[in-house]
Amino acid sequence: KALVSEIEKNGLKEEVQVVKTGCFGLCALGPIMIVYPEGTFYSMVKVEDIPEIVEEHLLKGRIVTRLVYQETVTDNGIKSLQDTAFYKKQHRVALRNCGVINPENIDEYIGEGGYQALAKVLTEMTPDDVIQTILDSGLRGRGGGGFPTGMKWKLARNIVKDADQKYVCCNADEGDPGAFMDRSVLEGDPHVVLEAMAIAGYAIGATQGYIYVRAEYPIAVERLEIAIKQAREYG
């Protein structure tokens, strides 16, 4: 709110777009702000820092060095965040959109290829094709057992073929103290969870689903509700 207010105060409302995202990964350095197109990464930003960033960077084009993540500062300017020690060896899959898109905007998810996998599944593949693809991928559960996901789906589809109703249950609860993997996905990219559940439902023959998420994660709950509403509106 402080950033939006300061931007409007300086007459930049039509020139600068503020996009909220999920956690970008360096949680200990939050709150963070990334200014594009150059990708300047400001860390541990306080409300009182906002006027300086807007005036110096957005108006005058001068980076506020004291607030920049120091590893990105070089003699030749600002290097990409992806080249820093924390990120350069990462290959994001489930978290690829977190910190990049606005989790409350379905169009941004679609713009990054969202729901294309579901479209392909529904138009080009049978449920057995989907299950075989998951089996071939070697995808396994994140729990201690590491049970093959494709085998779970195969069992769910075949054991009770004539069931009146099947459900997809998404366990978004963090069982380990201090773990925030599920929370990061739900807060940063909720549509990817809905798309995955829809694909799983098609594969096993389920038409309804439940998501179990902690009440202690109000932002995750709020963004899930927004995502569900948007997905329904888009059909």
Where do the PLM segments sit?
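Feature of Fe-S/electron-transfer and energy-metabolism proteins
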Residues: 1-235
